[in-house]
Amino acid sequence: MTPHDEQITALLTQLDQALGSPATTHGLARTLRAAVKEVELHRHHRASVADLSDGVLKPSPTKIQIGGGGHRIEGFLNIDIVPPADLLWDVREGIPLADDSTQEVFSEHFLEHIDYPRSAKHYAHEAHRVLAPGGQLITGVPDAAYVLSQYPAPPEQATEMIERWYAKRECRSDINTYLDLINYVFRDQDDDPTYNPHYWAYDHGKLVQLFCEAGFKTVEPWTFDPTMANPKRRWASVYVIATK
Ligand SMILES: C[S@@+](CC[C@H](N)C(=O)[O-])C[C@H]1O[C@@H](n2cnc3c(N)ncnc32)[C@H](O)[C@@H]1O
């Protein structure tokens, strides 16, 4: 174990002890839980870094999915920071592929979960770097433009949208009005540590700007393909396909 890994292990022990103390207040506990989660992600990532000689996957996969969670796609190498991915990797640190080495990068409902601008812009540049010329980046996110366009929504419509997105979440009982729904699209911050917050909201125009800035030649709307994308994401999401 390296000195850094020893430090991280000691830190985790300290965080657990502080969290277990009755003196720890609600605000401090929230921050400590977030820190524990980051430490655990960091450990997954460090273990994968140690397994990769030269820091890149060899041979390079033809297609990769980023942040697929439980939605694995056949024929793709599935990269996520938590299981059941093929590679546990923190994409905020880059994409571990060689330059110009892959044909397709797919993600949906992932981009809004990494901080903007640093990590979102880094991701766009990394996707551009690893794609071969002509390669394609497909990206789907919750469509903030759609959600905002419905405001102010009548209570029945608000209830329908809330049910579609949050029926299975523990937070469901706290999402009561349309403005609560808008808050969630922009800042999804469940106290449940298994959820990643939303850090930034996107629409078609923002995706075009982000990927053009990263060097992609064209960014067009992508026609939803349920053989690849998660069918539950079809509603109220916006997808684009960017070509290098
Ligand atoms: C809301 S889920 C979406 C899962 C799937 N794409 C879908 O549409 O059902 C977001 C996913 O992004 C992953 N994720 C978040 N931050 C990440 C990071 N820094 N590196 C890799 N994956 C990350 C999470 O672990 C999670 O699986």
Language model: regions and residue ranges:
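A structural signal for well-ordered alpha-helical scaffolds and beta->alpha junctions
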Residues: H45-V49, K63, H204
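Short charge-dense sequence patches
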Residues: A50-P59, F76-I81, S149-W165
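S-adenosyl-L-methionine-dependent methyltransferase catalytic module, highlighting the catalytic core
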Residues: R118-H122, E126, A132, Q136-T243
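Short low-complexity stretches enriched in small and charged residues
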Residues: R30-H42, K58-I66, I95-P96, N196-W200
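Conserved SAM-binding loop
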Residues: P61-S149, G205, V240-K244
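A short catalytic or substrate-binding loop motif that flags glycine-/basic-rich loops and adjacent residues
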Residues: L57-K58, G69, K232-W235
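Membrane-proximal basic amphipathic "stem/tether" segments
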Residues: M1-K58
